[in-house]
């Protein structure tokens, strides 16, 4: 089965072709960072317009790379939510229209489900059940994954998502958008820090997260410093250490409470070097398994949507109609 995947939930336009027999045939991505940098963050209207401009060229590109024609496609999967409503509508309208023209099924895909399954796309031997740590700019959740479509929410953020906390903390210290990755890089390059930040919500039971207080702690520390570049790096180091250790503590609890020692890390923050290293060390100590998508599949992309769509379409699923329906807010579990 050949499935075209379309991702347009926020500020990246992703398109891919996945084959149920041969795997990922091609994928392409357009990032809108340059468009939004001058505004200091994502502007929804501009994001939607950019998707309109790039969807058709990207579809042509992936079909050419895969050496297939449109009429060879068996289905089209598209992100229907959660995300920015305008951006979602662009992708869904395009997908449904193309599917209608080709007389093939279209299927709405949950953005977070696509992230959860991205590691399985590269490692088909990854079996259910597993615990997933979903860490991105919009989400920070621990999820028990028992099968495709069978999810149980174990813990969620009460305020900022972890990627959001990185970006906001960076902005508070004068690092331009998108600052989260720059902040992490400063932390990685800093050998040591005199600062010790709190590990929020680790002194009580449960698997929920909270990062807004950590962000405030970083701001206060920055304002009390001489605001030199070395101060920025040391605060970044302390902030990242606190975030990573907090995530590790919560993952330890989730694994201990579950019947599985398999952990999957999903979402853009899954590319963080310090987090990857710490999780690999811990999981090795408990003789467990940890799975990360390749860096290019951590952030939003069309490949994960095409893969999730292929899995569901092979079970006979489709939208069953041509009406367009997106869900900007769409709980996974």
Swiss-Prot record:
Its main location: cytoplasm. GO terms for biological process: tRNA threonylcarbamoyladenosine modification. It comes from the Bacteria. Coiled coil: none annotated. It is an enzyme of class 2 (transferase). InterPro entries: ATPase_NBD, Gcp-like_dom, KAE1/TsaD, Peptidase_M22_CS, TsaD. Fe cation binds at residues 111, 115, 300. Disulfide bonds: none annotated. Its cofactor is Fe(2+). It comes from Legionella pneumophila (strain Paris). The keyword NAD does not apply. It catalyses: L-threonylcarbamoyladenylate + adenosine(37) in tRNA = N(6)-L-threonylcarbamoyladenosine(37) in tRNA + AMP + H(+). Substrate binds at residues 134-138, 167, 180, 272. Its EC number is 2.3.1.234. Required for the formation of a threonylcarbamoyl group on adenosine at position 37 (t(6)A37) in tRNAs that read codons beginning with adenine. Is involved in the transfer of the threonylcarbamoyl moiety of threonylcarbamoyl-AMP (TC-AMP) to the N6 group of A37, together with TsaE and TsaB. TsaD likely plays a direct catalytic role in this reaction. Belongs to the KAE1 / TsaD family. Pfam families: TsaD (PF00814). PANTHER family: TRNA N6-ADENOSINE THREONYLCARBAMOYLTRANSFERASE (PTHR11735), TRNA N6-ADENOSINE THREONYLCARBAMOYLTRANSFERASE, MITOCHONDRIAL (PTHR11735:SF6). NCBIfam families: gcp_kae1, T6A_TsaD_YgjD. This is tRNA N6-adenosine threonylcarbamoyltransferase. Binds 1 Fe(2+) ion per subunit.
